[in-house]
């Protein structure tokens, strides 16, 4: 697996075949039992795994595409990441540039944003909406999750003319999130 990632990263460099990757949005290194994905230009240390959390989606897609065969990890990730509806959604909402560095969401960010979106769009009989909390560890991509969430909501709910307000509890977090939004040009 590591060799496949290294080769894919190497092949994007000037002395190899960068033209092959010119229009690619998502790249994947895989063998039967392991998969890692990234965007073009992503250094090896930032390649990551995808863990499908929508088991109904995965089960239906695997049944459709494999019909009776035992799926491998490669099969599961190919279906999870490259099902037509999913890959288009990932490209549209979940790839961004952070200070001119192309980034794609991690699976945790994707599924958190999808759940938040459902909650934001759902109201009770009096028009009230639920609130919620997403817990992230330090360095897990909270700022980028907020940027991707804002992008998703602003694009998905465009007819409603949504506004996004980010509230922080510390000046340092305020500076950090402001910088992240500015670097992604979503400010």
Pin down the residues of each PLM region.
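ATP-dependent helicase/translocase motor core
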Residues: 1-168, 172-187
């Amino acid at each position: 697996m590591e060799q496949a990632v290294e080769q894919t990263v190497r092949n994007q460099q000037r002395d190899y075949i960068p033209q092959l990757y010119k229009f690619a949005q998502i790249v994947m290194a895989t063998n039967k039992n392991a998969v890692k994905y990234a965007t073009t230009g992503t250094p090896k240390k930032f390649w990551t795994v995808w863990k499908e959390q929508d088991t109904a989606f995965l089960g239906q897609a695997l049944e459709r595409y494999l019909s009776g065969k035992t799926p491998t990890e490669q099969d599961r990730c190919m279906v999870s990441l490259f099902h037509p509806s999913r890959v288009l959604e990932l490209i549209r909402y979940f790839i961004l540039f952070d200070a001119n560095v192309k980034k794609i969401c991690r699976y945790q960010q994707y599924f958190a944003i999808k759940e938040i979106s459902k909650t934001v769009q759902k109201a009770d009989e009096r028009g009230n909406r639920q609130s919620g909390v997403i817990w992230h560890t330090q360095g897990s991509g909270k700022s980028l999750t907020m940027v991707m969430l804002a992008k998703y909501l602003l694009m998905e709910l465009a007819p409603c003319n949504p506004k996004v307000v980010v509230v922080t509890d510390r000046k340092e977090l305020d500076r950090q999130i402001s910088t992240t939004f500015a670097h992604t040009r979503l400010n």
